[in-house]
Amino acid sequence: KAHEDELKNHLCMINTDMAGVVIGYDVARVIGTKEATAHCDAFMRRKGYNVGVTQEIYSSDSIPFADKGVPAVNFIRFGHHVGGTFIHCRNDLAKFLSEQSIAKTTQFVLDYGIELIESEVFPFERVVPTEMVEKVDKYLAKKELAEAKKDK
């Protein structure tokens, strides 16, 4: 809340999560309009990056931004448990990561960010559509919290 007034200057939030997994696959989860999703997908295809792009929420640092109306693109490298991803547990070890994998993620995230920054006209609206807002609200349990406050 201390920086809430600064959000008006943010057109999109880019978040990277779980990068570096050796055995895995790259995805982008867009919390934004269908146009924002299509833009990200077209960019990845045009540049030849093998990144699966979908419009859906993702539990990460982008949620507070989306909750305030700032669209977000989450870049994630999901892994497989055989030589892959163990998250927040005793098997969450650096031996399952590689510099090459981190460099690959870094490159397409950087390229995408540059595309947005250098656009003379921003390529999609600064909108989180209603259906995405509802999913974010459900994730944050806003309805349940409001009802709990009423019951007090």
Could you say what each language-model-derived stretch is?
Residues 82-151:
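His/Asp/Glu-rich mid-to-C-terminal helical/loop segments that flank catalytic regions of hydrolases
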Residues 1-74, 78, 84:
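Metal-dependent peptidase/peptidase-like ectodomains
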